[in-house]
Amino acid sequence: TLSIPLRQAIHDTLAADKQAILLLNRRGNSRALVCVDCRKAPECPRCSERLTYHSANNRLLCHYCGYSVPVPDRCPSCGGPLKTLGTGTQRVQQELSALFPDVGVARMDADTVSASNPHEVILDRFRRGEQKILLGTQMVAKGLDMPNVTLVGVLDADLSLFTGGFRAGETTFDMLTQVVGRAGRGSFAGRAILQTMVPNHELIRLAAQQDYDRFYDLEIRLRQVQHVPPFADQVLIGFQGLQEPQVLMGAVKFRDSLLQLQRSGDFGPMELLGPAPSPVPKINYQFRYRLTLRCRMEKNIRAALRYLLCAFGKDSKMRGVSAFIDVNGFMD
């Protein structure tokens, strides 16, 4: 998990009696169990997502609906043996403890932060020097001012680049520049090491250099080509319900109605994509589809969408299907 350069940098930092912050660029533990034989992973029965493995309580958890179950002894599908897949903070902590057995490692993630162990307590222990390494997920990326921290390491620095959505580059650059800025905030020089599978990616290099101006030039040109904000509005029209054929039919009807209004009115340039399954196609037994509309949200477009949404709600054939609109938002 930890590259040789990062291991050496941690060793040098500890030898100088300084501290290090390590960020795992994933939500929570981001680990799954996978069957060695059939390669299937246990999935949430309510959603279309694989369950995340939490070794602290030896349970599988769905981060969308909250479904939780003890880890099975064997694969639920074929009875084969299960193994963990992915890198979690718990595994990185174990690796750090094995490499540096005499050094305390503070871990700050969804499993360790609680009412009885709030993040303030974890950070206070680290600030006092009781622990020399702070390991966490994105909650350690911002707002920390620790003068004795001279090293920051980011594992899977590129992971959030490939999560989809027009903001992926922006959010990745923001996260990386924030965490890089945690090193060397006192009178000691700091350094940062980004572990990535794409070291030549322009965004990764600019984040390491904290070069916002060049990143902006790169990102704004890309968004203009993609016809996404700020050059156009991106409207996600979502549909969800218990019966998948009905949900899909509702999305198709809404699309056809919108295209008919477009032909009869003056809407200006408009790109309509879908319907397609949402990135998470099912949550809590609800099937999810969406349309993607790229246009300028002018008055006539807003009026048309309000009209279609109202008509959809009154359609008796669509009873049980809900529709909603998200403009330039974060809906998945």
PLM-predicted stretches and their roles:
Residues 250-257, 303-311:
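Short amphipathic alpha-helices in soluble, non-transmembrane regions
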Residues 306, 310-332:
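Generic C-terminus detector
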Residues 255, 290, 295:
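Acidic, two-metal ion nucleic-acid-processing modules in DNA metabolism proteins
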Residues 262-278, 319-327:
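Short beta-strand elements
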Residues 265-269, 282-287, 299, 312:
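Nucleotide-binding motor/catalytic cores of P-loop/tubulin-like NTPases across gene-expression machines
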Residues 97-99, 263-265, 313-317:
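Short, conserved catalytic or adaptor-binding loops enriched in Gly and charged residues
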Residues 1-248, 260, 279-281, 290-291, ...:
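Inter-lobe coupling/hinge segments of SF2-like helicase ATPases
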